[in-house]
Regions:
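Helix-to-loop transition at the C-terminal end of transmembrane segments
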Residues: 20-37, 51, 73-80
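Transmembrane-helix motifs of polytopic, lipid-linked glycan transferases
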Residues: 112-132
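N-terminal membrane topogenic signal
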Residues: 1-10
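Membrane-helix interface segments
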Residues: 5-6, 133-139
Length: 161
């Protein structure tokens, strides 16, 4: 690609392709074992300031993923004073089932919000490669990041692993 404009068009197109891939994949993946308790813990962090439901993982992804839920009047199960892992797991399942049912609309929104981190990572790959190796290498690196199966498979999950 010659010129700055062509490079930026390619970057925007590749990032759009990555976002489209994530949106496509999000609808086809079932919930992981502990994804609902991460979602519930993130929601509780925003509304109560309680970081104790899922303290073994850093809160950034949980908080970012649950931003789309802010302002909604969601049912929250009463905490029963169980061990924090049991509390988050059991209440997370109930919370998601009561508020989202089988539609998985909330899951879709939370996963896409978490996927913003992957889009940011891809842009950082582009900028770092451009700084170190030039524009052509940066576009190649961005293309590799956008179509990397590992990044695609895990980027839109609401996980902290």
């Amino acid at each position: 690609m010659n010129g700055k404009r062509g490079t930026w068009v390619a970057v925007v197109c590749l990032i759009a392709v990555q976002a489209a891939q994530m949106a496509y994949v999000v609808h086809r993946e079932s919930l992981t074992f502990d994804e609902d308790n991460h979602m519930f813990a993130g929601n509780m962090m925003w509304h109560t300031g309680d970081f104790g439901l899922n303290p073994e993982h850093p809160p950034l992804v949980k908080l970012l993923a649950t931003i789309p839920l802010l302002g909604r009047n969601l049912w929250v199960p009463p905490l029963k004073g169980r061990f924090f892992k049991t509390e988050a797991y059991m209440d997370g399942r109930d919370w998601l089932a009561r508020n989202d049912g089988g539609s998985q609309h909330m899951v879709f929104q939370m996963r896409l919000a978490a996927g913003l981190l992957a889009l940011g990572l891809s842009l950082m790959v582009f900028f770092a490669a451009r700084e170190w190796f030039g524009q052509k290498a940066a576009l190649i690196a961005l293309g590799l990041a956008v179509f990397d199966p590992n990044l695609l498979a895990h980027s839109a999950l609401e996980m902290t692993d």
